[in-house]
UniProtKB/Swiss-Prot annotation:
GO terms for biological process: negative regulation of DNA-templated transcription. The keyword Electron transport does not apply. Pfam families: DeoRC, HTH_DeoR. GO terms for cellular component: cytoplasm. The gene is ulaR. This is HTH-type transcriptional regulator UlaR. Residues 3-58 form the HTH deoR-type domain. Residues 20-39 bind DNA. One of its GO terms (molecular function) is DNA binding. Keywords: Cytoplasm, DNA-binding, Repressor, Transcription, Transcription regulation.
Amino acid sequence: MTEAQRHQILLEMLAQLGFVTVEKVVERLGISPATARRDINKLDERGKLKKVRNGAEAITQQRPRWTPMNLHQAQNHDEKVRIAKAASQLVNPGESVVINCGSTAFLLGREMCGKPVQIITNYLPLANYLIDQEHDSVIIMGGQYNKSQSITLSPQGSENSLYAGHWMFTSGKGLTAEGLYKTDMLTAMAEQKMLSVVGKLVVLVDSSKIGERAGMLFSRADQIDMLITGKNANPEILQQLEAQGVSILRV
C-alpha cells in the first residue's frame, strides 16, 4: 500500500469516526506505530487532520448532508458510482429488485431507471426520482414516515412489507468477517424481515467500511451472496468473507 493510499484510508477513518488512535491506525493499515505517527504528522502539517496525544482528530467542518441535488458531494462519490454501475449489471430484464436507503442506493436506482425492471423501495428520495423520470414499475413500501432516514417503516411484525424480489441491494456502516453492520436499529429490523423472501442479498459498501464494526449486526456473512466494494478494501477481510461463500467484486 502506498503512502497516498494510507493517507486516504486514514482520512476516511476520521471522516467516519471523528477520532482514531495510533493503535487503530496500525491495526487498520497493517503498519508499524512509527509509520502511523509519521503519516499523522504529515497530514497534520498539511492541515488535513489535528494531531492529538496518541492519535488524531478530524478537523471539524460542517459537511452538508447529501441530497439528490448535491449527490456529487457524498463521501467517496466516485467509488460509489462504480459500485452502483456494477450492481446494476447483475439484474436481468423482467426481474425485481429491492433497494434500500442511502447515497449508493440512490445511485443504483438512478442506474436502473428506465430499464425493464421492477424497483421496490421504501426510500422516498429514490421513489420520487423514479416517478419523476417516469420509470415504468415502481413499488413503494408503505408505513410510517421516518424523517431522519427519509424512508417508510411498517409496524413491527407487519407482513405487508414482505415484497419478494429477485435481488436485495443494501449497505451499512461496517462489514467484517462476521457480517454487515447497520447503525439505525429500526431501519435494520425492517430490512431484516425481507431477508427470507428475497432471492439474493448483495451488499454495496465502499472500501472505507470494510473491517469496521458500527451498530448492530444486520446479516451474518453466510447470508450474503455478493459484496461489491472498492479496490482499496482490506484484502484480509475479503478473503475471510470469500471463505464463507461470499462472492467478491472489486471496482
